[in-house]
């Protein structure tokens, strides 16, 4: 390629010189100077919206772009017309691209087996204007289409016969409207400037999500991409597609970032989804330009993709059943690395993704995240980071919203995260019920997703999506990072918490996310304080609030919360060294301070829970006789990963699940669709559960996964990130009453002696979870104090140390193995664990 690069640079110098002396040479004929007249005059449209990936749902036929790239220079009529383009010119172009020396090509070779496609011109153009293009920024995403797409083949075939190279190279403004072949729908685009390449009409970047059987020539541009250039060199552009159904994901083993250096040299523009934000990916030549591909859901065969090809072209340059998809540029949902791909299910880091995808329904959503079919998708994704994605997620039924994240119902909200129900909110993340909250993410339907995802990074709000219905999710995910609220989560049952996730104690959140039931909260998604509390309890089943909780919630207000946050931060800063040493004999002062904070969250219980259960004595006895991994609970994050639990808080990424925080995000995403909805979360849909979901990165993977509910569980799910992964997952659904069941799960988990990560967790859980006693520095102290205070369920001794707080705020100030820092942890450490009671 070095030789060809030199050749290209030499040509560019010559062309530039010609352009300087003959800038007005627009009348030069194609065969004696088309480079000057055509390429040099390529217009750059300012402020052109980026294309948003076409998402197709349902059987698709016809052309992906009005004219299939493989047909641009293939019309048979060209061979017989006097006005045929000069073949020497094409040979020159092919040689510039390093395909073959012109001396080795005949006219036929150039025209049919190796058609000059827009991608080739883009590559050539990028070599000439790469620096300028980087400054201008490229289009971001293309459109989303749902249902059978309008077939323009009749019009296109008519145009193809009349196409001349001059038409394709002429400035955009001089072309007839019928020849532009720009994407039909381009809702809402963001981007500084989009360079209009030689073939502006064929720009649709990838990232199409397809759901259902797809066939037709829409697949042709994939084919040409692989035929263009050496197949082995194109491998770097191919990342998994994420297929659900007959075709499984085939490229999960690829490292999206490993080949970026090679990709940037290849300089093939418009394969990526540009990102939206102050710093957006401008071109594939930039390091930060991941490109994604499509998500396919449903039955999808290669035979379907090749239906529109002639037999003569069916095997063009290695086209085969198992070849093209692997090398299609773009990978789908999740990625890992400093530069995160622009979308997909949930990523958090320096560069967060812009959106997610896939839409389904008879009516196309104008712009939204994705979701599917009569059975609502099993999850929603929310991502947060320094650069938060612009949109949220949506859910769909027979009728998808016309704009906005896709909403479903007779009345679609004007803009919001989508919701389901006869009446959706007019603005806001969608709510369901007779009276929906004014702003929140909850989703509801007969078949609702099994969980919600909320992710938070250094500076970003975390949303949570909760879903509820007859089939309610077993849990929700909320994660919190250095500076971000983690919230929301869903409550289900006849009685929904009246205020704010139902958290009680000094640091109760001002609002909560989504609630479902006869009584929905009036305002959700709202957080108070620079650092919003992070918690996420999800309850499913009949649940009554305690008297103390109700009284506290009636009295609390935003001002109190803000003031209490400041007071608690000051108190935490005053912790004595002696107290720190008590927490851990193995850690230094700074680490002890880190350990000082108690975890913010409690478990999420599903089903009717017996509030009277006393677990102290039973738990102690079990711990002495049982050893094993935790059965469930909330996962926690910190230097020492708790063995189980839901929410995580700390500098280090959460050990599991859909939400990832930090520089490294999970490598894959999810989102699956099918007739049957998954019984577990992170939801994958289909008759068969995915074998590997939610991939995550870390030295150690969790032994099970997020805890899924259903007859069949995925073999590996919700992966986790961090050196120490939770051994199980969290959140379970089913009737769990009485302390005995809970005791068993705890005792199985925390009596593994010699396991450093579990010692502090043992301390925390014996205290904050159910007993409310101070955390012990080690297992021996824990057992001693457990015996002494096992009957003290109210934890009054601990509460007195801080201030008068409702008895329901057990474990409010318990030491925790996890914390963010002296100052940043203070906000989260006091989140009430009592909502689980």
UniProtKB/Swiss-Prot annotation:
Residues with Pyrrolidone carboxylic acid modification: 641, 653, 677, 701, 713, 725
Question: What does the record give as the function of this protein?
Answer: Reduce interneurons B4/5 activity. May play a regulatory role in nonfeeding behaviors.
As recorded, the propeptide runs across 26-47, 61-134, 150-178, 194-201, 215-234, 248-266, 280-285, 301-325, 544-595, 610-627, 734-837
Q: Where is the signal peptide?
A: 1-25
**Record-level GO cellular component terms:** extracellular region
Q: Which GO terms describe its biological process?
A: neuropeptide signaling pathway
Alphabetical UniProt keywords:
Amidation, Cleavage on pair of basic residues, Neuropeptide, Pyrrolidone carboxylic acid, Secreted, Signal
Q: Where is this region: Disordered?
A: 567-594, 772-837
- Where expressed (tissue)? High expression in gut and CNS.
Taxonomic lineage is: Eukaryota, Metazoa, Spiralia, Lophotrochozoa, Mollusca
Name the record gives this protein: Enterin neuropeptides
Q: Does the keyword Signal apply?
A: yes
């Amino acid at each position: 390629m070095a030789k060809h690069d030199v050749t290209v640079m030499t040509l560019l110098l010559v062309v530039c010189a010609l352009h300087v002396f003959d800038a007005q040479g627009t009348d030069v004929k194609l065969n004696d100077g088309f480079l000057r007249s055509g390429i040099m005059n390529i217009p750059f449209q300012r402020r052109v919206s980026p294309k948003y990936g076409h998402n197709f749902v349902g059987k698709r036929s016809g052309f992906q772009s009005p004219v299939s790239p493989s047909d641009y220079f293939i019309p048979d009529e060209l061979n017989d017309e006097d006005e045929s383009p000069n073949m020497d010119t094409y040979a020159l172009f092919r040689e510039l691209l390093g395909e073959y020396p012109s001396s080795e090509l005949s006219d036929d070779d150039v025209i049919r087996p190796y058609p000059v496609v827009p991608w080739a011109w883009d590559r050539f153009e990028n070599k000439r204007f790469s620096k300028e293009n980087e400054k201008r920024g490229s289009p971001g995403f293309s459109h989303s289409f749902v249902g059978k797409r309008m077939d323009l083949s009749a019009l296109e075939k008519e145009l193809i016969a009349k196409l001349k190279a001059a038409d394709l190279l002429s400035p955009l403004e001089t072309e007839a409207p019928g020849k532009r072949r720009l994407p039909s729908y381009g809702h809402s685009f963001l981007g500084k400037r989009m360079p209009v390449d030689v073939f502006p009409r064929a720009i649709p970047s990838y990232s199409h999500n397809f759901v259902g059987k797809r066939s037709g020539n829409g697949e042709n541009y994939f084919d040409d991409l692989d035929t263009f250039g050496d197949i082995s060199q194109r491998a770097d552009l191919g990342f998994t597609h994420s297929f659900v159904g007959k075709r499984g994901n085939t490229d999960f083993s690829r490292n999206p970032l490993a080949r970026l250096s090679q990709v940037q040299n290849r300089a093939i523009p418009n394969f990526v989804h540009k990102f939206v934000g102050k710093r957006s990916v401008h071109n594939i030549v930039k390091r930060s330009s991941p490109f994604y591909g499509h998500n396919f859901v449903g039955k999808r065969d290669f035979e379907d993709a090749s239906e529109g090809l002639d037999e003569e072209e069916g095997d063009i340059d290695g086209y085969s059943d198992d070849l093209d998809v692997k090398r299609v540029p773009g990978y789908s949902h999740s990625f890992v690395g400093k530069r995160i791909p622009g979308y997909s299910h949930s990523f958090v880091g320096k560069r967060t993704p812009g959106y997610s995808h896939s839409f389904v329904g008879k009516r196309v959503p104008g712009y939204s995240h994705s979701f599917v079919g009569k059975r609502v998708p099993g999850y929603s994704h929310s991502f947060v980071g320094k650069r938060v994605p612009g949109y949220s997620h949506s859910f769909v039924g027979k009728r998808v919203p016309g704009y906005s994240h896709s909403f479903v119902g007779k009345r679609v909200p004007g803009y919001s995260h989508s919701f389901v129900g006869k009446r959706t909110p007019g603005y806001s993340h969608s709510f369901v019920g007779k009276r929906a909250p004014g702003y929140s993410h909850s989703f509801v339907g007969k078949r609702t997703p099994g969980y919600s995802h909320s992710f938070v990074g250094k500076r970003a709000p975390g949303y949570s999506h909760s879903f509820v219905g007859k089939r309610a999710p077993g849990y929700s995910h909320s994660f919190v990072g250095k500076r971000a609220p983690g919230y929301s989560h869903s409550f289900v049952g006849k009685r929904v918490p009246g205020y704010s996730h139902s958290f009680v104690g000094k640091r109760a959140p001002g609002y909560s996310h989504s609630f479902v039931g006869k009584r929905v909260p009036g305002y959700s998604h709202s957080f108070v304080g620079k650092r919003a509390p992070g918690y996420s309890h999800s309850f499913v089943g009949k649940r009554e609030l305690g008297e103390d909780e109700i009284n506290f919630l009636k009295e609390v207000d935003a001002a109190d919360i803000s003031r209490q946050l400041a007071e608690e931060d000051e108190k935490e800063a005053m912790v004595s060294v002696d107290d720190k040493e008590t927490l851990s004999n193995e850690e230094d002062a700074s680490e002890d301070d880190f350990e000082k904070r108690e975890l913010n969250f409690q478990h999420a219980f599903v089903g009717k829970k017996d509030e009277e259960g006393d677990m102290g004595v039973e738990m102690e006895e079990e711990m002495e006789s049982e050893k094993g991994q935790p059965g469930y609970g909330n996962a926690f994050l910190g230097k020492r990963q708790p063995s189980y639990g839901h929410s995580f808080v700390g500098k280090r990424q959460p050990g599991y699940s859909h939400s990832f925080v930090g520089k490294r995000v999970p490598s894959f995403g999810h989102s699956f669709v099918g007739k049957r909805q998954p019984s577990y979360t992170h939801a994958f849909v289909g008759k068969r559960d995915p074998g590997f979901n939610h991939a995550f990165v870390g030295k150690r993977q969790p032994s099970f996964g997020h805890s899924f509910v259903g007859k069949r569980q995925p073999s590996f799910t919700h992966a986790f990130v961090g050196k120490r992964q939770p051994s199980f997952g969290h959140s379970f659904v089913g009737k769990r009453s009485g302390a005995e069941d809970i005791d068993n799960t705890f005792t199985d988990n925390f009596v593994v002696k010699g396991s450093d990560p579990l010692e502090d967790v043992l301390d925390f859980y014996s205290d904050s979870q159910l007993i409310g006693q101070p955390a012990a520095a080690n297992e021996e102290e824990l057992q001693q104090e457990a015996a002494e205070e096992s009957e003290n369920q109210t934890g009054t001794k601990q509460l007195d140390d801080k201030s008068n707080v409702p008895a329901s705020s057990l474990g409010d100030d318990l030491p925790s193995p996890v914390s963010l820092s002296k100052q940043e942890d203070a906000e989260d450490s006091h989140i009430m664990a009592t909502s689980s009671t």
